[in-house]
């Protein structure tokens, strides 16, 4: 097979791991920087060019689209879909998962456990937002934040109101969420491939930090997940329409609650923590499922 990996950085652990898994199985693999692609958008012969060369003959694409390039990266993925190339994660699913508010609304509609979340346009409803999530302490999140950035724990009501008004003064979109204190600064990252949880780890925030992201200095250990947590992760991936993703779950007093569904999860932390060949299992999944034109949206975006 000829497999393309859309990634801006060939040297990243995740990209390297996928390249090695492709090579080990005898596939032709190419790392493509999506920002260096440009497109001929035409009705009968859509194409993608890369430094003057047409990108042709690909059997599958693995999108590794960073949050900062979601718009252009998804346009490139969509173009591959229009050309009939199988994409592990479709453009519409990536876009859906990157919108925190839209994700929560879709998950809520299907009955997935979530932290109580409030959202408003105007600061005149700040007190109501705080009441909706049960008062302080509470969590305030920038909708555009990633890797734990733009996430603040407000310990008191006055602090919460000040932070909300400060963010709104910058015209930032924010979510206000209940603080799950019983999680004690930890979460569960479940990696889902093709509707199955293939690996999971517990991430613990560093001392004094409620954020468990490894990018923020957290640590990781192996964990045995419950059947309910497994079901929650699988259902969340399906609702988002993602063939490959990381589902972040908190253990609350009322069962598992989903914090995020990540369409481009890092492989380093979970592969090193669990000794599971995640990249290899993803390539195995592609081998079984890659067919020309096999997109749920049929390239319609």
Swiss-Prot record:
Top-rank lineage group of the source organism: Bacteria
GO cellular component: cytoplasm
Residues engaged in binding Mn(2+) 1: 248, 260
Enzyme Commission numbers on file: 6.3.2.-
Matching SUPFAM superfamilies: Glutathione synthetase ATP-binding domain-like
Cofactor: Mg(2+); Mn(2+)
Cofactor binding note of this UniProt entry: Binds 2 magnesium or manganese ions per subunit.
Binding site for ATP: 141, 178-179, 187, 211-213
Gene3D superfamilies: 3.40.50.20, ATP-grasp fold, A domain (3.30.1490.20), ATP-grasp fold, B domain (3.30.470.20)
Residues the entry annotates as binding Mg(2+) 2: 260, 262
Classification via HAMAP family: RimK
Stated name of the protein: Probable alpha-L-glutamate ligase
Organism, as annotated: Maridesulfovibrio salexigens (strain ATCC 14822 / DSM 2638 / NCIMB 8403 / VKM B-1763)
